[in-house]
């Protein structure tokens, strides 16, 4: 059972608007690459990809906006959820023991695993990019295998 707000928030019309918003934000995130000319072919990964050495300031902004801020927001939200889960048994009367439903816990755990996988997969590439942006000479000292592995 979910709240009455759910039907209003996720109506067919609103869902279409959310999808359009996601695509608009995606295009908005890509457009600056054309002006900075940061999309270049990289023979190490055999692909056209974001060149971290084109503009240090731009690379730092990309890492902050597309990785650090989302990780920070999601971490904050998960901490709030865990704090709430820990505090709920203390707020409820001792004789009535609320139990977390198995499907609620499974859903929470699934979303947490998705978050951890996002962080684990994107952290190496973003931290290498941030290191190269802050110290450009460091780019030559990063082993090619490490750079290539960060893409996979």
Swiss-Prot record:
Residues 35-58, 133-144 are extracellular. Keywords: Biological rhythms, Cell membrane, G-protein coupled receptor, Membrane, Receptor, Transducer, Transmembrane, Transmembrane helix. GO terms for biological process: rhythmic process. It comes from the Eukaryota. Its main location: membrane. Residues 1-13, 80-111 are cytoplasmic. GO terms for molecular function: melatonin receptor activity. The keyword Cell membrane applies. The chain crosses the membrane at residues 14-34, 59-79, 112-132, 145-152. One of its GO terms (cellular component) is plasma membrane. Induction: By cocaine, which increases the levels of day-time expression. Pfam families: 7tm_1. It is found in: Cell membrane. It is a multi-pass membrane protein. High affinity receptor for melatonin. The activity of this receptor is mediated by pertussis toxin sensitive G proteins that inhibits adenylate cyclase activity. PANTHER family: B2 BRADYKININ RECEPTOR/ANGIOTENSIN II RECEPTOR (PTHR24228), MELATONIN RECEPTOR TYPE 1A-LIKE (PTHR24228:SF49). Belongs to the G-protein coupled receptor 1 family. This is Melatonin receptor type 1A-like. The gene is mtnr1al.
């Amino acid at each position: 059972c979910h709240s009455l707000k759910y039907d209003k928030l996720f109506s067919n019309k609103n869902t279409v608007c959310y999808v359009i918003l996601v695509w608009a934000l995606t295009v908005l995130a890509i457009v600056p690459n054309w002006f900075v000319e940061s999309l270049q072919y990289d023979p190490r990964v055999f692909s056209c990809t974001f060149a971290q050495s084109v503009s240090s300031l731009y690379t730092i902004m990309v890492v902050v906006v597309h990785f650090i801020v989302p990780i920070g927001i999601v971490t904050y939200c998960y901490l709030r959820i865990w704090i709430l889960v820990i505090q709920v048994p203390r707020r409820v009367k001792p004789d009535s023991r609320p139990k977390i439903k198995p499907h609620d816990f499974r859903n929470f755990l699934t979303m947490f695993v998705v978050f951890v996988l996002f962080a684990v997969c994107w952290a190496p590439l973003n931290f290498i990019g941030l290191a190269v942006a802050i110290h450009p000479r460091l780019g030559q000292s990063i082993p090619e295998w490490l750079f290539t592995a960060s893409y996979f």
